[in-house]
Design a protein with these regions (language model features):
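Short glycine- and acidic-rich boundary segments immediately preceding or forming the N-terminal edge
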Residues: 25-75
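Intrinsic-disorder/low-complexity accessory segments
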Residues: 26-42, 89-92, 96-100, 124, ...
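Secretory targeting and sorting signals
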Residues: 1-25
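Generic recognition of flexible, low-complexity loop/linker segments
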Residues: 64, 119, 169-170, 261-265, ...
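Proline/glycine-enriched tight loop/beta-turn segments at coil->beta junctions
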Residues: 73, 82-88
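Active-site/substrate-binding loop(s) of hydrolase catalytic cores
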Residues: 86-95, 100-257
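Short, surface-exposed beta-strand/loop micro-motifs that present aromatic residues
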Residues: 75-80, 261-267
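Active-site-proximal beta-strand/loop segments in catalytic clefts of secreted hydrolases
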Residues: 66-68, 80-81, 92-95, 133-137, ...
């Protein structure tokens, strides 16, 4: 199969989405979105057929089932790589079911990385394994709803892990230990204060290691935004309204440091995280297909920045994430239960002298041992020590002062 498609690879990868050639037996498969010219989103059966075709055609690709939704739809993880690598990027696509552009961008990215024979793709996959959850909320996607079939916002479930979707993502992060987590979303604009083609934001949570935080900002400011702007898309910081004349920030409406959002949890778990949001509404009067293509193509432009970052800043990312994973074993420093990198914490939001650990009752341990395990938190029976890689996460799960705690453990101060 690969020898037959070699002649069309470069053109398929370089062409804009609208110009991908018509499907033929010897060309890469196309999504339902592409087949329709942007008139409709890819259906679940089309997605499954598309992924199966890519998997069969490329030995770079493997697909595994990482969970099942309440309505019995598969949660899948796609791995793209040519060999084992020390660096991993995870794309999480459409946690909100009514935000489809990220899913479409992820599907075409899977194909392009699977089929790509250009030097840039080969170089990327030599150093970096790319993991993709192409539809993180299949039930919500089928119903065109933000939440899953129970109405739960998956992107507010990365502490409690009550949903099958949240649990599957937690297990992937625990087991694969990605160095970068890239979370694709969409937003509704508020002209003229909040209306860019793309917004993005790094982990603001103050428990993020400084070097990981710095790399996440570098990913945003020096790679993702310039890549999008080079293709003609406007960019900005998610959650910040700005004056349309001066560009000065005038109001924050989202993007705080709460740990239950994947963007922040990624930082707490020592990965370089970034949220990306494409604007749903068009800036000018255009047809729905044309606007839908803009939504998806802006995401694809930003992804070019992510992959450039992975290649050019890989060594620095490896150093930052590795050091952050080791730092918790020193068991020093405060833990923050509030505040953000742009919102200094109140004294009550800082645990200046954290306990050695937390003791759980037998009933508490029985009730929450699965969630602790999915997070990757190390336990000693019913005792949960702070001296471990995920040191800062332990109080966020078990301390009475943490706003989204799982349960309240008994602090152990006898160190």
């Amino acid at each position: 199969m690969k020898s037959r498609v070699a002649a069309v690879i470069a053109a398929a990868l370089a062409a804009p989405l609208l110009s991908i050639p018509a499907h033929a037996a010897d060309t890469p498969p196309r999504t339902g979105f592409e087949e329709s010219g942007g008139a409709r989103w890819t259906s679940q059966p089309e997605e499954q057929g598309f992924l199966a075709a890519v998997d069969e055609a490329s030995d770079r690709v493997s697909i595994s089932r990482i969970g099942t939704t309440k309505q019995d739809r598969p949660l899948q993880l796609v791995r793209i790589g040519t060999r084992p690598t020390t660096r991993t990027v995870l794309l999480v696509c459409s946690q909100h079911g009514d935000e489809p552009s990220g899913r479409e961008a992820c599907l075409t990215t899977i194909r392009d990385l699977a089929y790509g024979d250009d030097e840039r793709t080969r170089r990327l996959l030599t150093s970096t394994t790319v993991l993709v959850v192409p539809t993180a909320n299949p039930d919500g996607r089928a119903a065109d709803t933000r939440g899953n079939s129970d109405g739960v916002d998956i992107n507010r479930d990365h502490i409690a892990l009550r949903t099958a979707e949240g649990r599957a993502l937690a297990a992937v992060i625990r087991d694969r230990k990605p160095d970068m987590v890239y979370d694709l979303h969409e937003y509704g604009g508020t002209p003229p204060y909040y209306d860019k083609d793309l917004f993005d934001l790094w982990p603001r949570n103050l428990n993020t290691a400084p070097d990981v935080h710095e790399e996440a900002q570098t990913l945003s400011l020096d790679y993702v935004r310039p890549a999008a702007r080079a293709d003609g898309y406007t960019t900005g910081t998610y959650g910040i309204w700005t004056d349309p004349v001066t560009g000065d920030p005038i109001r924050q409406v989202a993007g705080d440091g709460q740990e239950r959002i994947l963007r922040n949890m990624s930082g707490i778990k020592h990965t370089v995280g970034l949220l990306i949001e494409s604007r749903v509404e068009p800036l000018t009067e255009v047809s729905e297909p044309v606007n839908n293509l803009r939504r998806v193509n802006s995401q694809l432009s930003a992804l070019k920045g992510l992959f450039s970052f992975a290649g050019e800043r890989g060594r620095q990312v490896d150093e930052a994430t590795s050091a952050a994973r080791l730092a918790g074993w020193r068991d020093t420093g405060p833990v923050y239960v509030g505040g953000a990198d742009n919102d200094p914490p109140e004294p009550a939001e800082v645990i200046q002298d954290p306990p050695c650990g937390y003791r759980l009752t037998d009933d508490q341990y029985t009730q929450f041992k699965d969630e602790l395990s999915l997070h990757g938190v190390r336990t000693q029976g019913t005792y949960v020590p702070l001296r471990q890689s995920l040191r800062a996460l332990v109080p966020l799960l078990l301390d009475v002062r943490a706003p989204y705690h799982l349960t309240i453990g008994e602090p152990d101060t006898d160190c």
